[in-house]
Amino acid sequence: MENVIKNNDLQNVKFDINSEFFVIDANNLEKVSSKLYGFCLDNSHIVLDIKDLHKDFGNEGAYVYVKNDDNIITVKQDFVGCYGIYIFRQDDYFAISNSFMYLVDYLKKNYKLTFNKDYANAFLSSNLETFSCQETIINEIVVLERNAIIKINKAKRSMEIIHKNYQENSLEPDSKEFFASLDMWYFKWTKFIRNLKKKTNNVMVDLTGGFDSRITFLLFLGANINLDEIFINSINDNLYTHKKDYEIASKIANHYNFKLNQCNKFITSKSYYKKQDCINIFAYLKMPFHKQMYVNVEKNNSPMYSFNGFGGEAIRSYWNYGINGLIKKESNLCYSMKKYPKILKSIKKIIKRASRSIRNSYFNFDDDYFDICYFRETSNRTHFGKATLEWFYLNNFCLSPIFDSNLHKLKLSDRNCKDKNLLIAIIFTRYIKDIIKFEFNDGKYIDPKTIKYAQYLNNKYPFIDNQNKEMVSKSNNINDVSETMKEENTDIEQKNNEVMDYFNSVFLSEKTKNIFTSLYDDDLYNSIVLDSTKRYFHPLMYAFPVLGINKFKQDCNLKTNNVNNMTYFDFLKTQEGNLVDINKIKKKYEKVDRKNKLLTILGMKFIIKNKGATKTLVAVERERERESNLSPR
């Protein structure tokens, strides 16, 4: 076992921006290196080096693949599109990157960039992540669809974009092809879990009272491994639905005879990022697309493998809005439209343009799946996809079998059962039949008629498991390091707090306020300041967009002959200065509130003017917070 690092002997590790992100410049194609950025699941193994990939490697993982052959450069990405591929074009020139901020920093030296105010408005108003599909905060840069593949002809300096047909939602439930694809998914992941367990016990799987984590967990039951040798994660506190989640998970654990939350199974020591590394990882992956920061200072020296139910909303009944419903949903988070009518207009523009983009990029587009497609192209890749990469840089491989492209070929319902929970009902009643007997949290359930029809289809197309799977057990000589880890926790918590405190100090600087209020106004900035003082969960989630908007607005205003090479952390240092007076802001707005005249700005939850509306807002906010309440270990 590796030595656990003591408080007084912390080992630092550096994040190298230039090796983790790239720019392919049309004028320097010969300098492009072949590389796999991120990780790929190939032939039931995790691959990090492009040399280890098979010719027809899989779509699963979180990666951008760059291959420089004799005359062709190929760029493609995973099924979810976790990084995003960002493209700038001007006449015959093009530049491509796997990081939006990295590309902007590269281009601003030589090209005039313009600010997309519609995007900035809509992102400020959004609940958690952008609901744009291809647009970005820079008008000249777009993010490619996740099924896009780039072919660059080096001799001609030309670029072709090809769209791969993933055949999403194409297979009818009442068909052999449907069940062949579903069983392929099941065998693939149970094999992967068994192979992984033979190598390591550094495995964590979530188990809650929800649909999505249970779909992933049943694969662990089907894999026939020793569950008491891994960490089965079920949070037991009073937040959100955690109490009920833990109660349900405990019943499942008792039924299948395993224990929850045995965190002392892990064998790994830690290295530590400095403050600037954490800030740069977050910024180059997620700004300006997402409002929460999950990366922290701890990096595992030995890899960890965390399984979850990310992306489950795409395989069940969840999103049922339509275009007008989406506009209404996002507008409901921005109540002060009399004061900010331009924000409402921007929301409408972004959603309508995104919906057109989705319809044009899908093969055989089906209106019945519009919401699912919108989720895949926006929230799924931005929220879950980018979180997967944040944790990857902590040496934590975040794995969701629900991301598998084979699963997304399947239709969610059919003419005999229009309930879009049919697919998950088939999964729950096909492989581990007892698993559906346990209740779900938060009032969730699957219609008994849907379950009955799922059982009918499973009988019509029976599951045949001819694999003789002996129990996989790997007993490590594991010491209980919990006391040592407790010694570390105080120092690590302090270091993580230093990162957030620094972000907060820059957000509260007079310079930040002056730049932001030149675009908006004092009321909006002050509302975000107040929200950051009252929000318990991710208190800076509305402050991060302010810092991102300011950065990219300044990038657009720069003279190209006066640009220094700076990282995002370097940029933040230029924004430091005197702080705004929070107490003065509080007094001003508390006084207005007593007169019941406080405007509700961006739906900040500390405002109580309209109780009914506030309750609706908090419910939406808390549901999304539950989705992202996973901590890398």
What are these regions (language model features)?
Residues Y374-T388:
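Core structural elements
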Residues T567-R633:
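Boundary detector for helix-to-coil junctions that initiate low-complexity/charged tails
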Residues I50-D52, E60-A62, Q134-I137, P288-K299, ...:
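Short alpha-helical segments and helix-capping/turn motifs at coil-helix boundaries
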Residues M1-D206, D212-C263, F571:
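Cysteine-centered catalytic environments shared across enzyme families
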Residues N320, D434-R535, G577:
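PAPS-dependent sulfotransferase catalytic core
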Residues E2, N7, I46-K51, K329-K338, ...:
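An N-terminal alpha-helical hairpin/helix-loop-helix interaction module that forms a charged
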Residues K154-A155, H163-D368, G385-F438, T450-F463, ...:
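ATP-dependent adenylate-handling active sites, centered on carboxylate activation for C-N bond formation
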Residues K154-R157, L399, K433-D434, S473, ...:
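Catalytic cores of PAPS-dependent sulfotransferases
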